[in-house]
């Protein structure tokens, strides 16, 4: 069977950027990597209702900066910034002996963000809404918002069926093999009474073309 490469990993360094922006030697690399995973897992669990699309981590010698991309910045910031301070205090258990800086980045259009779309479908499945209805409505909203193509897939015991299967719906174009194509990808899991259901979403936002340098040629006066 044909397998699909991760759309983000395929494009890193070409049109996509790294989510972890730091360098470490062999001695500290594994510790930093595990710490990154723990930070992401903790923030996702603690602030699930805030609609977190992405967490970027930047490191220096004595500082860790977190860029949290969220659809609901007010939920994280809290009244007078109390939410940020509370989050910093909680992260001290994971990040030892380093200053923590938290930067909140607002996701302006949650309906076209693949990760938030996947989490939205998963949340609907947990509320016993039909997977077909959840996927089709999400696709319709994204297409209305101006995306060029959307593809969704749900895998597991759909509708409580005894045999697990995968169902997909798509609209528009999704050029997965085109490196310059800006493909956003999201994954989420729904915990249902019949087990887990995996949700994948691909969103095509157009091509990212290199900027052409226009050289102005001055005509020599005769």
Swiss-Prot record:
SMART domains, A to Z: KH (SM00322)
In Gene Ontology terms, what is one molecular function of this protein? rRNA binding
GO BP terms, alphabetized: translation
Instruction: Report whether Iron shows up as a keyword of the record.
Output: no
* InterPro entries assigned: KH_dom, KH_dom-like_a/b, KH_dom_type_2, KH_sf_prok-type, Ribosomal_S3_C_sf, Ribosomal_uS3_bac-typ, Ribosomal_uS3_C, Ribosomal_uS3_CS
- Known PROSITE patterns for this protein? KH_TYPE_2 (PS50823), RIBOSOMAL_S3 (PS00548)
Query: Quick one: signal sequence residues?
Result: none
Q: Matching Pfam families, A to Z?
A: KH_2, Ribosomal_S3_C
Family annotation (Gene3D superfamilies): 3.30.300.20, Ribosomal protein S3, C-terminal domain
A GO CC term assigned to this protein in UniProt? cytosolic small ribosomal subunit
Which keywords, in A-to-Z order, does the entry hold? Answer: Ribonucleoprotein, Ribosomal protein, RNA-binding, rRNA-binding
Which residues belong to any copy of the KH type-2 domain? 39-108
Q: What does this protein do?
A: Binds the lower part of the 30S subunit head. Binds mRNA in the 70S ribosome, positioning it for translation.
Q: So what family is this one in? A: Belongs to the universal ribosomal protein uS3 family.
Assembly and interaction partners: Part of the 30S ribosomal subunit. Forms a tight complex with proteins S10 and S14.
User: Mind telling me what this protein is named?
Assistant: Small ribosomal subunit protein uS3
